[in-house]
Amino acid sequence: MALVLDGRALAKQIEENLLVRVEALKAKTGRTPILATILVGDDGASATYVRMKGNACRRVGMDSLKIELPQETTTEQLLAEIEKLNANPDVHGILLQHPVPAQIDERACFDAISLAKDVDGVTCLGFGRMAMGEAAYGSATPAGIMTILKENNIEIAGKHAVVVGRSAILGKPMAMMLLQANATVTICHSRTQNLPELVKQADIIVGAVGKAELIQKDWIKQGAVVVDAGFHPRDGGGVGDIQLQGIEEIASAYTPVPGGVGPMTITTLIRQTVEAAEKALG
């Protein structure tokens, strides 16, 4: 029977540890770690994600500072808000909720975030440092996936990992993190030819493509580790990027959808904010 990589249970365990660390930091410095979240516009899903992150802050004893900006906000106005947060010594982490309205240069705004406060791992500088094996906060979803693999004693070194997806916040950093852990990595995307054949070679498969059940169950080889980073609402529940029905008969381990990667994304963001606060406050 396949091992279920339960992200929800692991996230709860990590949050319990973070609560202790936050209390220790408060006792030592009299200061509370603060995550600033910036929401631009009125996208309902984005507002939900920001609320979930605020709830996670409260669970570990942190504070969150919510910045809400109107839909018509310009790049210059958003950059000015980010600069204020960079300069605010009470703020230890900055999250710019993706996506932003089309008129905003999202990349310029991500890269304006101070490296020390880039707890969501979105800056080019942070990505470059991570890719070179230097200290930086990793993009939250792939960093959460690496924690799931590590905590479940999944062997990565020497394994063939296939990452399906090449986005700047998921596919690319995921591939770099697996490479740093000594996997042999193949990156696939929408233009990849012979995708089923490449997936069949994977010891570890990561679905990060953003298309519901694109990766078919019969593409996956016996004994593979299956990580599904996608979520697509369906019939009151949801599915991922990988066809998971019956996957326990094929995989040696897999992340369920929901309850696998998702909870660890938010917990990783919170953990990296606590780490940033510990560094800033000594």
Swiss-Prot record:
Keyword Amino-acid biosynthesis set for record: yes
Positions contributing to NADP(+) binding: 165-167, 190
| Record bears the keyword NADP | yes
Keyword line: Amino-acid biosynthesis, Histidine biosynthesis, Hydrolase, Methionine biosynthesis, Multifunctional enzyme, NADP, One-carbon metabolism, Oxidoreductase, Purine biosynthesis
Read off the InterPro entries from this record. Answer: Aminoacid_DH-like_N_sf, NAD(P)-bd_dom_sf, THF_DH/CycHdrlase, THF_DH/CycHdrlase_cat_dom, THF_DH/CycHdrlase_CS, THF_DH/CycHdrlase_NAD-bd_dom
Which terms under GO biological process does the entry name?
L-histidine biosynthetic process; methionine biosynthetic process; purine nucleotide biosynthetic process; tetrahydrofolate interconversion
The Enzyme Commission number assigned here is: 1.5.1.5, 3.5.4.9
GO molecular-function term, one example from the UniProt record? methenyltetrahydrofolate cyclohydrolase activity
- Annotated GO CC locations: cytosol
Reaction(s) catalysed by this chain, per the record, are: (6R)-5,10-methylene-5,6,7,8-tetrahydrofolate + NADP(+) = (6R)-5,10-methenyltetrahydrofolate + NADPH; (6R)-5,10-methenyltetrahydrofolate + H2O = (6R)-10-formyltetrahydrofolate + H(+)
Biological pathway: One-carbon metabolism; tetrahydrofolate interconversion
Q: Which domain of life is it from?
A: Bacteria
Q: Which family does it belong to?
A: Belongs to the tetrahydrofolate dehydrogenase/cyclohydrolase family.
Function per UniProt: Catalyzes the oxidation of 5,10-methylenetetrahydrofolate to 5,10-methenyltetrahydrofolate and then the hydrolysis of 5,10-methenyltetrahydrofolate to 10-formyltetrahydrofolate.
Q: Subunit notes for this chain? A: Homodimer.
UniProt xrefs under HAMAP family: THF_DHG_CYH
Protein's name in the database = Bifunctional protein FolD
Annotated organism of origin: Acinetobacter baumannii (strain ATCC 17978 / DSM 105126 / CIP 53.77 / LMG 1025 / NCDC KC755 / 5377)
Q: Lineage, please?
A: Bacteria, Pseudomonadati, Pseudomonadota, Gammaproteobacteria, Moraxellales
